[in-house]
Every structure is written in C-alpha cells, then in structure tokens.
Amino acid sequence: MELSVLGQNNGGQHSAGGCSSSSCGSTHDQLSHLPENIRAKVQNHPCYSEEAHHYFARMHVAVAPACNIQCHYCNRKYDCANESRPGVVSEVLTPEQAVKKVKAVAAAIPQMSVLGIAGPGDPLANPKRTLDTFRMLSEQAPDMKLCVSTNGLALPECVEELAKHNIDHVTITINCVDPEIGAKIYPDLLEQQAHPRRQGRKILIEQQQKGLEMLVARGILVKVNSVMIPGVNDEHLKEVSKIVKAKGAFLHNVMPLIAEPEHGTFYGVMGQRSPEPEELQDLQDACAGDMNMMRHCRQCRADAVGMLGEDRGDEFTLDKIESMEIDYEAAMVKRAAIHAAIKEELDEKAAKKERLAGLSVASVQNGTSGRYRPVLMAVATSGGGLINQHFGHATEFLVYEASPSGVRFIGHRRVDQYCVGNDTCGEKESALAGSIRALKGCEAVLCSKIGFEPWSDLETAGIQPNGEHAMEPIEEAVMAVYREMIESGRLENDGALLQAKA
C-alpha cells in the first residue's frame, strides 16, 4: 500500500465514539460492554445494532441528487419503483418536502427511530439541501436520530456543520486504501477533474481517512461501508478493516456487490460477478478479527421507509402526504411511549438471554468442545426477534450459525415470495427453486408454518424444515434445534469420532 500514513493509528488513541477492541459489538449482549453514552446512541438504531433492527424502523429522504464521484457499481435513478438497491429513488424531494414526509412517516410508524440522508447521489455533494434538511428536522422533530451516508470526498469540510446539526451517526463508503485498486472502482472523481486520475483517487482516500479521524475526535459514531468486489478488492478489504478500526470506526459493513445487468451499472454490463454468500461470510469472518462487523445490512434504496427488509415508501408519496394532517407534538408522545416499551422488552430479553446463555451453551458442550460441528440455519421472521413467518410468505431469510459456543447471526438471503395467495400458492415452482438455491449451505429452515410441497422439496435438497418453534425467540429456537441435531447423532465431527474410538 503506497499511503503508509493511512495505517497510522494516532498512537492508539480513540475517542469514546470509536470501537477500539473486538469486544465492541452490535448485538445486544455485546452492547452491554459499551459505555452508557455509546450504548444510548446505538440501542435503537437499526443499522448500528443487529438486535434493534428487529424492533425499530428507519427512513431515508432523497434530497441529494448530485454526486461528485462515478463508481463502477452505481447507476443513479430518480424515478424508479421496481429496483431495491442504493442510488435508486421514486422521487427527489426538496428539504421542505422531506421534513413533511419525515413527520408523516414518524406519526404513522411510531417505532421509526432514525432519519438518514443517503442519496440518490452523495449528500455532501449537495451540502445546502442536506444541511437545510437536517437543520429543519433538528428543530421540528427533535426526537429523531439523524444520520448521513457519504463517499467521504467532501467530508472534512462538512464535519463541523454535521456536528452542529446533531448528526451523531455517519457512514463512509471506503472500498480501498490503495489508489491502484481505486482505479478499478472509480473511473472519475468529478470534483477532482483538474488533477490526474490517479491523483484524484489518492485525494479521495486521504479525504476519507481525514474525515473519519475528525468525526471520531468529535464523538460521532462512524460506520464504514465497503462493497466486496470479487477479484478487485476482496482480499484488500482485510487491510481496510484494520485501518478503519485503528482510526476509531465503530462498525464495518462489508456488503456484496450488486451487479445485475438490467441495473445498467458498469460492472453489471461488463459481467463482473457478485460474491457468493459463502465468500461474503468468509471475508466478514476474516475482518471480524480486527473489527466489529455489521451483517444485517439490506443495501436499502435512498428513499427506503420502514423496517429493514421492507419498504413502505408507496404509502408516503408526495401526493399522499400533501393531504395529511400531522400533529407531531401528539406523535412524539406516542413515539416516546412505544420506544420506552420496546426498550423495556429488550432489557427483559437481554436479562433472560444472559441467564439462559450459560445453561444452553453448557448443555451443548458438556465437556465436548470441538466434538460437534457448527450448523447454518435459516429463519423466516416478520420482526420482533421471533419465528413468526410462514415459509411461503418470506421475501428473505435470516441465517444463523449454531455451535457449541452459542448462536451468532451470519446474514440474510433474499428470495422471491413463494406463496402470494390461495390461487397461486404452491404453483410458483421457480420461486421455490430460487429459495432452495438461496438457502445453499443451510441444514435447517425454521418458520411458523410451511406447506407440504416446499417441505418435501427442501428435504430432498438436504434442508430440514422445522415449524415446531413458532412464536419463539429466534436464538432460543435455533439452539433448541441444534441440541436436537446433536442428540440425533448428526453433528459428530469425523476427527472427534476417530479420536474417541482410538
């Protein structure tokens, strides 16, 4: 790597906003190790806490159409309703329209906790529109968490203004710390056209690192997003993870490249492949030794509304919100009560989880650590951290790994909905086949209900359906199924068996 300065860690000094050890985490039990002020920032942010995303909603407002970089994986669209990816919106809003929309959504979806600006261009390439929106929201919706996502090119010049408007979560997309690798990702840096291209990419990297340091110094939590591009930066992202951790980033989100040809991106048109789920997990696991990882990202649209994994944007188009009467003072009272109830539920769940964790893991280990191999299981859930969705109604499955050490969240797999009504349920063979392909590597799928045909096809594919744990907490259900697998003798490691026989 040429820019050795990027690897410096300021003597190992981090502000309270940074994650300086691998014990920093995004799941509920890991949050308990954080300082109280940091935990308060994270516990109801669905992007910064894996636990929170089961309970809290978010929305993005599309006030930033322009961008200062052209990335090979991006093709912005401003009037698109049928694609689910970053850089895509149905309508671009003025700051005033955005504020009204936020208040309308917050009143209708009281569990919404976060408002973000993430495009469809770069928010900081549209500083007036972005900062005007934040200024009005901090005045008119003071109970809302505010966050912004940026490529970082204009970040250092905006840090003071962001801090002034109470933005305490910032995401920076950092795909490399080496200009040679950047040359394969960024063909043009539009604000740096006076510079040679290689010099422009070097400036981008320097600006990203400088902005990260400035944010951390001000106690602003930073999440780093990185797009995993096989054959381009996949191995290099391990170095990126080490560097951003050393500089105090709180969370690293390694996302898979989206490269469908119909999206019109350079990579999509040129046939650059996306990573397989197993490749993504391997890279995330490799980075996890140096950095706390986000694994529940849905790569949302720039106008997403609702819980992660759902989009209710059609309910809040400009023509619909124009006629809405919004009493935001009353909405804040209702929102505060609902948020308090969710926090109480999460606290009770965390206490119960702590009591049960030692027992459940001990009952699996029982002095046989290493004897039983880990297992991937898919889960159908509609939220609340429960097994509460019919297999045929799922548009995604959450994937968990169970092992003698416990249960950990791995990621999610998107699928086409198999069952869309009584007349078509069971007739969508292609959707079922796609679901089975998406669940490759999983040995069980937990759901509230499942029909005979998908049950049979899943078993044939070596995936065991399980509907016995409906409405149970996900991690408890996954561990229960894992114990059942152990008791059936399915999970003995070959090496452990040979050693036992010897």
Swiss-Prot record:
Stretch list, region Disordered: 1-21
Keywords: 4Fe-4S, Iron, Iron-sulfur, Lyase, Metal-binding, Nitrogen fixation, S-adenosyl-L-methionine
Cofactor: [4Fe-4S] cluster
Ligand binding ([4Fe-4S] cluster 1): C67, C71, C74
SMART domains: Elp3
UniProt record, GO biological process: molybdopterin cofactor biosynthetic process; nitrogen fixation
All copies of domain Radical SAM core, residue ranges: 53-301
Binding site for [4Fe-4S] cluster 2: C297, C300
Family matches, as InterPro entries: Aldolase_TIM, Di-Nase_FeMo-co_biosynth, DiNase_FeMo-co_biosyn_sf, Elp3/MiaA/NifB-like_rSAM, MoaA_NifB_PqqE_Fe-S-bd_CS, Nase_CF_NifB, NifB_C, rSAM
Role played: Involved in the biosynthesis of the iron-molybdenum cofactor (FeMo-co or M-cluster) found in the dinitrogenase enzyme of the nitrogenase complex in nitrogen-fixing microorganisms. NifB catalyzes the crucial step of radical SAM-dependent carbide insertion that occurs concomitant with the insertion of a 9th sulfur and the rearrangement/coupling of two [4Fe-4S] clusters into a [8Fe-9S-C] cluster, the precursor to the M-cluster.
Name of the molecule in the record: FeMo cofactor biosynthesis protein NifB
